Amino acid sequence: MKVTILHQKFIRFVYLLDLELIKRKFVLGLSGGQDSLALLKLLCDYRKTYFGLLKLVYCDHRWRLESIANAQRLYYLSEYSNISFYYFATSTFLSSETQSRTWRYKNLLKISLSFEYSYLLTAHTLSDISETTIYRLVRNLRISEINNLLFTFLYIKKTLSISRPLASVTRNDTYWLCSLSYLPLWSDYTNYWLFLSRNRIRQELFPYLKNYFNCSLERYLDGFIYSNKINLITLNIKLKKILSKIFGYTNDGLYFNVSLFKLLPFFYQHILIRDFHFLFFHNYRSPSQFNRLLFAIALEKSQKVFIRKQYHII
């Protein structure tokens, strides 16, 4: 085994594992592309040292005519590596990426929980995370939802977590490892369907931004998400302390301290009202509706206002 920079990064991921879970069971979602094969190569190189049982799972969306041949190639690869192989094929047509992703994770979680596996490994790279960040930014998602993209471990249950061992490497790195190891890559032409939004970002927008604005765009977005995540954690700690002083319970019900709320900066006011509205009424409102509510609170002369479930924003 030739140790490369990707092997060193992978070892850093192994050190993050719970020591009690090392040598246990792992499920790897496989597609046959360069990212998943690079992850399989790293797992096989350190299998005897760190890992116990491995299972490969291939989910066939049946978008391609040769998808069954792709599955057969992966099956032969699993036989060569002495790893169990599971194949799932959809019985209905999946018309969108969202439906395909939901169906794929449903099967991956099903087999992981059924056999009581410790980790579900996916081959998402830093390039995938960066592309998803841009995709969600242009769709005007909340910054907290973007921060959730950057994770190495996502705990589903006490005994199972989804893990991304390649979250710190780019797609160019995985291609280099596959070329160095002569791995049998399978070209997926659905990645070039430009009517899919994510493919258009990957094939057109992302290369344009890297070529003309920032050649290290993945690293920049990685730092952007990380710094925002730290700032958000700090902000949430402050807001929880403020929230406990502004909202409270009495015999008459839940009350809202108007006089103390008015002393806060407008930015804090907006976040407090938005998050409280979601926790209490389980939905989000538009920014214009929240601005009207904040304006109504500014005109309120009472010291405290009791909140009822029947209240609504016009």
Swiss-Prot record:
InterPro entries: Rossmann-like_a/b/a_fold, TilS/TtcA_N, tRNA_Ile_lys_synt, tRNA_Ile_lys_synt_N
Subcellular localization(s) per the UniProt record: Plastid, Chloroplast
Keyword terms of this UniProt record: ATP-binding, Chloroplast, Ligase, Nucleotide-binding, Plastid, tRNA processing
Entry's Gene Ontology molecular function annotations: ATP binding; tRNA(Ile)-lysidine synthase activity
CDD domains in the cross-refs: TilS_N
Gene Ontology cellular component terms for the protein in this record: chloroplast
Binding site for ATP: S31, G32, G33, Q34, D35, S36
Free-text comment about domains: The N-terminal region contains the highly conserved SGGXDS motif, predicted to be a P-loop motif involved in ATP binding.
The protein, known as: tRNA(Ile)-lysidine synthase, chloroplastic
Phylogenetic lineage: Eukaryota, Rhodophyta, Bangiophyceae, Cyanidiales, Cyanidiaceae
Name of the coding gene: tilS
